[in-house]
Amino acid sequence: MATRVYMHTLGCPKNRVDSEVMLGTLAEAGYRLVQDPAQAEVIVVNTCGFIESAKEESVEAIVELADQKREGRCRKLVVTGCLVQRHAEELARELPEVDHFLGTGAYQDVARIVSDAQAKRLVVPDPDFVHSSATPRVNSLPSHTAYLKIAEGCDNACAFCIIPKLRGGQRSRPIDDLVAEAAALAAQGTVELSLVAQDLTAYGQDLPGKVRLHHLLPELAKVDGIRWIRLHYAYPRDVPDALVAAIADEPRIVKYLDMPLQHSSDRLLRAMKRGRDSVFLRDLLARLRSRIPGLALRTALIVGLPGETEADFEDLLRFVEEQRFERLGVFEYSAEEGTPAAEMADQVPDAVKRERRDRIMAVQQAISRAHQQAMIGRRVEVLVEGRAEETEHLLAGRHAQQAPEIDGLTYINDGVAYPGEIVTVEITDAAEYDLVGRVVARDPSRAARPLPAAPRAAPARKGGLNVLR
């Protein structure tokens, strides 16, 4: 019988892709993938080491899964990822129950190390690995959606960020290799590609021939079967007009852009080495809104950066009120050892960070409610995920401006659709993050397919839906 392996992934979508590559490598080597750690002889934990809370979550997961070595079938526990790249020796001392620690440059070696009784316990080479279309990969999301990692590493030197030390410098994948992987995913049923990298807009700057992101996007849009292409982690420093035009003019690129801006205070932008000032950021946002009507912007902000005064924070609060982002996440600054920001004076107390985060979110929640209410009565395309987790009487899906895993859902309370099908939905109700609607149109070829009955939502109920309360 094949040895069973379970993968536990923490952190960002880029980490998910790394886990999928390791799963593919293990599956190709003959391992059987399972969803229950209690059934696995081998457990792999792919960690995050970006900020303190992520490190704590990773260690807790390792300790919890180590119980399977004492109580379950597990005979080998492997820990990989950013936390290992950063703290391998310390982890090895503190966690004797772990058999192997693999850094971010060793993902391709996981099957060899797991199967070799003589393999080293610590395998932490330079972080220079980047997978290709020829690398085995198992998509861990529902088959209709997948992440496509177009580059690895980062050449920026943001004062608060440890990622370049964990992931190495920018390494872009060639266009033909990315198109080949996109085509392979489409052949498995993928209709939505979410493009990810540490710095998406830096794509190609390290490749010969002056290749950039706006050259890649039209090629991906030609892949048969791909309906939606979504852009994440777009660094704002370099967004040329050609890229804006590609997003505006190509129908398969959804009008959604995830662009972490971090702050609006010029003083803090300089201190954090972001490379652009607030005038540039405002001009960029205005250019994007003007050139791409209906664009949904998601951003991430940091409160409590070293030296952030009340005046700096008020500037950020006004910026959020002014820009009215469709989606927004706020992080409390975490002082990371080895970064310039950790050595700066005037560190902000944790209580102040929390209070500032809460104030930003209170403002954003009102903005989100207004955006959501404006959706009522509109007809939008929705990618159906399947039955809602909350109740079998609803279907759950996402419209083009709802990204997987991080944004809200569109619940369907009237109509029929298959998972992976894109249907037209009329929005009838809205909450802070989620929407409700009814199916008003389907692709005739899908509606007539001789398959088992598609999931059907229950008719709309008067008085709204409990799932939105």
Curated annotation (Swiss-Prot):
EC number(s) stated in the UniProt entry for this protein: 2.8.4.4
Q: Where is the composition biased (Low complexity)?
A: 447-461
For the keyword Cytoplasm, the answer is: yes
Q: Which UniProt keywords apply?
A: 4Fe-4S, Cytoplasm, Iron, Iron-sulfur, Metal-binding, S-adenosyl-L-methionine, Transferase
Q: Where does [4Fe-4S] cluster 2 bind?
A: C154, C158, C161
| GO terms, biological process | tRNA modification
Q: Could you tell me which residue ranges the TRAM domain spans? A: 373-441
* Entries under InterPro entries matching the protein: Elp3/MiaA/NifB-like_rSAM, Methylthiotransferase, Methylthiotransferase_CS, Methylthiotransferase_N, Methylthiotransferase_N_sf, NA-bd_OB-fold, Ribosomal_uS12_MeSTrfase_RimO, rSAM
Instruction: Tell me what reaction this enzyme catalyses.
Output: L-aspartate(89)-[ribosomal protein uS12]-hydrogen + (sulfur carrier)-SH + AH2 + 2 S-adenosyl-L-methionine = 3-methylsulfanyl-L-aspartate(89)-[ribosomal protein uS12]-hydrogen + (sulfur carrier)-H + 5'-deoxyadenosine + L-methionine + A + S-adenosyl-L-homocysteine + 2 H(+)
Among CDD domains, the record links this protein to:
Radical_SAM
Q: Where does the record place the Radical SAM core domain?
A: 140-370
Q: What is this protein called?
A: Ribosomal protein uS12 methylthiotransferase RimO
The organism of origin for this protein: Anaeromyxobacter sp. (strain K)
